[in-house]
């Protein structure tokens, strides 16, 4: 019989909220022997009026810097996993550069990789309509093909 949650997706953005979400995912993984995928997303959409790069494109040096930062975030989670005695081989990491929105990228990655749970952190203070859930988390909850656990 298939475990309830065999593949867990956790978006990491370097915030305390995303690290807290990773802790929940680790705990769930311990219970169900789930595989965890940590992703960090760089939205590379060309923005009119940005001063970064030609015509607002994100310069390669920034992308490399962001990727290095994301690897540090992943390592922080992996250290927690080691400390808790879980198998690191069950954890995958991926830095994604995309012109799509962060929400769309999370959803596509979840579907493509057959995630059966998304665990996402939110600070929940991005405006009146989204007072309880942040805009990215709200979009993921609204459109995800699988259950979403929102951590505050």
Model-derived regions, located:
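Structural beta-alpha unit
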Residues: 1-3, 79-118
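Small/aliphatic-rich secondary-structure junction motif
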Residues: 2-58, 83-86, 90
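Short, solvent-exposed amphipathic alpha-helices that sit
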Residues: 24, 68-80, 105-107
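A short acidic, glycine-rich active-site loop
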Residues: 57-73
């Amino acid at each position: 019989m298939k475990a309830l949650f065999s593949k867990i997706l956790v978006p990491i953005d370097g915030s305390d909220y995303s690290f807290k979400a990773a802790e929940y995912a680790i705990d769930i993984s311990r219970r169900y022997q789930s595989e965890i995928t940590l992703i960090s997303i760089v939205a590379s959409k060309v923005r009119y009026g940005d001063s970064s790069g030609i015509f607002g494109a994100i310069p390669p040096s920034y992308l490399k810097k962001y990727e290095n930062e994301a690897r540090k975030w992943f390592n922080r989670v992996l250290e927690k996993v080691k400390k808790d005695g879980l198998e690191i081989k069950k954890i995958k990491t991926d830095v994604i550069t995309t012109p799509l929105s962060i929400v769309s990228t999370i959803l596509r990655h979840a579907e493509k990789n057959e995630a059966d749970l998304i665990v996402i952190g939110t600070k929940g203070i991005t405006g009146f309509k989204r007072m309880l859930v942040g805009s990215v988390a709200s979009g993921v909850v609204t459109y995800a093909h699988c259950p979403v656990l929102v951590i505050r």
